[in-house]
């Protein structure tokens, strides 16, 4: 029997370690560099960040739950985004880890730049556990999260064609290209609110 998929907010009582692992697995460039390809350390630090006032705070994470297990996550923020460098450094300390020059580079080249983004909602991370992939969970998770009255922004690696197709199927459109962290070609994508779409069409004669 197919297990029911539930889309809901993350709570502090959930399996935070799994959520931290999924955040780490979201991006094969930023997080392996930031944590020197040490996933166990990353899970500890990111777990502390989820509990603190950082860009990963649990109140900004939507989950897909299948059979009681967290199968996927969306990390999001309402603009303006607060990167919270101090809180991130404190999370490193609580995890008995050292925030070295790699953290500083990622903060300056990625996290810090988020504070200058436009209005709307920024989707920072989308990830489905490898054990649950191929079941349409990412589409269901995003479909349960997105609302017509909001404008959403995200970035996608250009070579990740499957992700780009998914976002386009959900109403996102490419609005720009840029060189992402480590020189990786990326797209900026936006899903305008329903109100914006109606406004754009209001002057068209029927």
Which residues does each PLM region occupy?
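Conserved acyl-donor/pantetheine-binding loop and adjacent beta-alpha core of acyl/acetyltransferases
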Residues: 80-121
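Conserved acetyl-CoA-binding loop-helix of GNAT-fold acetyltransferases
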Residues: 134-147, 165-169
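Active-site rim helix/loop that mediates acceptor-substrate recognition in acyltransferases
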Residues: 39-61, 65-66
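Conserved GNAT acetyl-CoA-binding A-motif
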Residues: 119-121, 148-159
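Conserved N-terminal entry element of GNAT/NAT acetyltransferase domains
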Residues: 1-14, 195-206
